[in-house]
Structures are given as C-alpha cells and as structure tokens.
Amino acid sequence: MSKIILTSFLFSILFFACKNKGNNHPKQTFILEQQRLIHQGDSLTPMRVLVITNKQDSLVLRKKSKAVLFSKQQDSTLALLSKRLVATVQDSATLGVGIAAPQVGILQNIICVQRFDKENEPFEVYYNPTIKQYSKKTQPCKEGCLSIPDRMDTLEIRAYAILLEYDKIDGSHQYEMVEDFTAVIFQHEIDHLKGILYTDYLHEKVHAEGKKH
C-alpha cells in the first residue's frame, strides 16, 4: 500500500519533474574559505573526511547545510567539488557507499550516493536533495559512517522506499522513487545535511524527533 501511495504521488508531479529551475536561483558562489578547500586538489584528489572524535570536526558535522544556489560563477567549483566527493568516497582509506559535503567541511546540500539499484552501481551526486515521502514499511540495516570510525550499528527505522526531490548540476529539477538499500544510503546522507548522525537514532529521544518526517 505504501508503494502504491508513493507511486501515485510520483505520477501526480510527473509533469513538473523536468522543469529547469536554474534561472530562478539568485547568483551566489562558494565563500572564499570553501573555494580554497575545494581547489586544494584536482578532481582525483580525495578530501579529508571530518570525524566525530575531533572536537572542531564535530562542531561542523552538527551544523545544518545551506541550499546550493546555481550560477555560472560557481559552475567550475561545483563540478570540481562533485568529482572530489566521488574520489573521496572511493578512496582506499575510506571506501564508503555514500558521502555528504559537510563530511569534507563544505556546508552545502550536496551528497554522493552509490546506486546499487542501477547497472554497474555508479556513484552519483545530488544537489538540494529532500525526501518528500517515506513508506510505512521499514527495513533493518547495519550502518556505518565515514565520520564515525570503527563502528557499525543496526537501525530498524529506515524506510524501505522513499520519494526523492533533487536538483542536477545543470539546475534541472527531478523526482525519483528509490527502494531497498539505496534508499537507506539516501536517508543516511540527507541526515548529514541536517546535522544528524545515524547514532542519534540509537537514543530514544532523538529517534522520536527524527521520525517527524
């Protein structure tokens, strides 16, 4: 039933899915500090991953990220950051299935997710991702985090299916329904954009707050 509801909602907004919103965003570039951090390496250079055990890193990881505002002025920086996120999550020192920009010190609504539901399981980057609907059906899943070294826990609260809304790098707007383990990755990474870590759900109080979707 949950999947039917999600599908119906997806069809109801289908005509708006490919609307280009790039011209609706005011122009804004990354702040100078962010630009310097992004341009410290080329597209194949991994970035340092912030960890919760470092006090300064922890403060950044707990902050909420800002919306990506597309403009020609920041196109090259945004493209470089996107490639460096992929390089970071694929780095042998980390080897994750997803990463969010705040984890490398960039407080922008950007995530990189490995699409296990697609051929060749590619890593893809998403801008301003939000979850519009969650299925009532949940799935238990063992989770870890690049920012929480040497730890894994099983969560019972992740939705089995989600309806995503996001922007692509060209500013076009998309909706997509995602299921199974890939849906878990999206939920985990989007939490990072809100300053939420998966371990927060292990505490009853935060769990209750987190379920207010």
Residue ranges and their predicted role:
Residues 1-28:
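Bacterial Sec-dependent N-terminal signal peptides
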Residues 18-213:
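Positively charged
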